[in-house]
Amino acid sequence: METILRTENLCKIYGSGENQVYAVRNADIEIKKGEFAAIIGKSGSGKSTLLHMLGGLDYPTSGRVYLRNEDIFQLKEDDLAVMRRRKIGFIFQAFNLVSSVNVWENVVLPMGLDGQKIDVNFVQDILHTLNIENKVHSLPNTLSGGQQQRVAIARALASKPDIIFADEPTGNLDTKTSDEVVALLKMSAKKYGQTLVVITHDEDIAQIADRIFVIEDGKVGSRG
């Protein structure tokens, strides 16, 4: 199976001298195409820092991140920004929806801003899969938290990225809604052949992943 993402001795250090702190220490990670991987750790363990480097949002102190064998931090800043827009999808705890435009516009907005052709049939299928096709004309503030997160998931899927990163995607949701959103997220990723990496502190979410990475005090280990 093709390797989509891998790292080599990835490190992130804050401070210097006696105040030096390793947020991430010599992380070696490999994720295959189509996998649902979970990175689990307690608050402050370094998991969000790790995600930001994997997604090209923050530079490492040392080490490498390869997306489809391309060393992303060797790219020029403009080229890295293009890669993030076109090859990486992000889902965050806070939804990050634009309050002044409707569901459909929120989903297709990133592609429109990037000048990409919008596959209308594909987007409609995603909205149907996530059971929000009847909300396309609704504004985000009229939706429940679970529905808003489904819109965020649809937005990440719509551009057909190589990989999707979800940072505590159920952090603002109740348990029942969280379970529904995670099940939909996994099902959607499988249906559309997406590779999914979820950052979480929730063991229940991690247990349904294909591969689990555990981060503690910046050190990353694999559980399967």
PLM region spans:
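Short, Lys/Arg-enriched, disordered terminal segments
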Residues: 1-3, 224
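ABC family nucleotide-binding domain
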Residues: 4-215
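H-loop (His-switch) and adjacent beta-strand-loop-beta switch element
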Residues: 212-224
